[in-house]
Curated annotation (Swiss-Prot):
Modification(s) after translation: Phosphorylated on serine or threonine residues.
Segments for region (Disordered): 49-89, 247-425
Assembly: Interacts with PEX13 (via SH3 domain); forming the PEX13-PEX14 docking complex. Interacts with PEX5 (via WxxxF/Y motifs). Interacts with PEX20 (via WxxxF/Y motifs). Interacts with PEX3, PEX7, PEX8 and PEX17.
Organism domain of life: Eukaryota
Motif SH3-binding per record, residues: 89-97
Biased composition (Basic and acidic residues): 315-324, 333-366
Membrane topology, from the record: Peripheral membrane protein
Species of the source: Komagataella pastoris (Yeast)
GO cellular component terms, semicolon-separated: peroxisomal importomer complex; peroxisomal membrane
Keywords: Membrane, Peroxisome, Phosphoprotein, Protein transport, Translocation, Transport
Family recorded in the similarity comment: Belongs to the peroxin-14 family.
Polar residues compositional bias, start-end: 256-297
InterPro entries: PEX14 (IPR025655), Pex14_N (IPR006785), WH-like_DNA-bd_sf (IPR036388)
Protein name: Peroxisomal membrane protein PEX14
Length: 425
């Protein structure tokens, strides 16, 4: 006999007395205790202690029946002991009306469910449908067909309207595109025409510029040559006027020829001269008054005009400039009128009518302008006649007539003193 381990037995007793495992079968309890390493004697002792010493024979029989497999393999198991008598079966419970009611309702529900299932799912598959059902199905199908047909008709109408709108829009777009193309072509043509006209204008401007430059150069050359000649003449006149004749004896002037006298007469009759009156007096006296023996030399007898009566170079240049500008403007105005007359004669008629009206409105101003032009022409003639006259070297220093005669002749000619005429010219 092996010794019983108290610690293991007490732990097994505590395990068996646990209320949580009280309802579990005894065989499982014994298997669990044996799995913890307890032997058969310790298991029996634990079972006895857990039951408080009662039923030792039953415990022993249970322990022997649930012994481990090792002991069973070595020793044949003993059959369980037969009980002393058989117990009677317990009587059947009595059934109340409630039980019958529950059974009736359950059978009624089950039977109704079976009927519905069979009538709805089984019989339609087994038996053909009735005529009423077929007619109802036909009516439903006809209604669906009519609804679908109406939907198709509305869809076709909407589609046709949409197609018409798209066609109208496409037509409008094509019209706008054609208009845009026409506008673009017109603008391109206008741009080309403008470019060509600009080119022509540039060429015309260049040609006008070249002609103007040439005219200006030619005018400059002519003006410079004329100014040179005028300056030379002025220098000669100043030298003759400023020269002092006191140092030289006065020689008798030779008789003027007929040509010089004619030239001087034409210069006198042509109008107011462009040079001072005092410079033309010696020539006239030379022709009209022959030299006499009574005339003596001296500053009192000489006719020397004052320096203020001689026109300055600035005045002469201004006159020449105004004259060239007037001639140039008149020539350009005539060219412009000819070009306008070729292009648009109505403008020329309007311009001439306007000019006639202006001439009627301002006749006095036109007369003044004509007088000025005549005076300028007379001055030009006088200058040309002076150039044609050849002055003798010392005959111009001959005695001049008395101042009374000079003033009387000048007043009889124009009514204005000679120095005023020289200043005005």
């Amino acid at each position: 006999m092996s010794s019983i381990r108290e610690e293991m037995v007490t732990s097994a007793v505590e395990f068996l007395k646990n209320p949580q495992i009280a309802d579990s079968p005894l065989a499982k309890k014994i298997e669990f205790i044996e799995s913890k390493g307890l032997n058969e004697a310790e298991v029996k002792e634990a079972l006895l202690r857990s039951q408080g010493g009662n039923g030792s024979s039953s415990v022993a029989s249970q322990v022997s029946s649930y012994s481990p497999s090792a002991s069973q393999s070595s020793v044949a198991p003993s059959p369980p002991p037969f009980p002393d008598h058989y117990r009677n079966a317990p009587p059947l419970p009595e059934r109340d009306w409630k039980d019958y009611f529950v059974m009736a309702t359950a059978t009624a529900g089950v039977s109704f469910g079976l009927y519905k299932v069979i009538s709805n799912y089984v019989l339609p598959k087994l038996l053909p449908p009735s005529k009423e059902a077929i007619e109802l199905d036909k009516e439903a199908i006809d209604r669906e067909f009519t609804r679908v047909e109406a939907l198709l008709n509305t869809f076709e109408e909407d589609q046709k309207a949409f197609y018409e709108e798209q066609r109208e829009k496409s037509g409008k777009i094509e019209d706008t595109l054609t208009e845009i193309d026409a506008i673009i072509s017109k603008t391109n043509e206008k741009n080309l025409n403008n470019e060509e006209s600009l080119k022509y204008l540039k060429l015309e401007i260049e040609s006008i510029k070249n002609t103007l430059m040439k005219n200006i150069d030619s005018q400059k050359s002519t003006i410079s040559s004329e100014l040179g000649s005028i300056e030379a003449q002025l220098d000669e006149l100043k030298k003759l006027i400023v020269a002092k004749p006191e140092d030289e004896p006065i020689r008798a002037a030779p008789q003027p020829s007929l040509t010089t006298g004619a030239n001087s007469l034409t210069s006198e009759s042509s109008g107011r001269s462009s040079i001072p009156h005092s410079q033309s007096v010696p020539i006239r006296t030379q022709l009209t008054t022959p030299p006499s023996d009574s005339d003596t030399s001296g500053p009192a007898k000489l006719h020397i005009p004052p320096a203020t009566s001689i026109p300055s170079l600035k005045d002469i240049l201004r006159k020449e400039k105004n004259r060239t500008v007037d001639t140039f403007s008149k020539s350009n105005l005539g060219k412009d009128l000819e070009s306008v007359a070729q292009s648009d004669p109505d403008k020329v008629e309007k311009y001439e009518g306007r000019r006639d009206l202006k001439s009627l409105e301002r006749p006095e101003e036109d007369e003044k302008k004509e007088d000025d032009v005549e005076d300028g022409g007379d001055k030009d003639k006088l200058a040309s006649s002076l150039e044609s006259v050849k002055l003798p070297p010392s005959s111009e220093q001959v005695q001049a007539p008395a101042p009374k005669e000079r003033t009387s002749s000048s007043s009889s000619r124009s009514g204005i003193p000679a120095w005023q005429l020289a200043a005005q010219s």
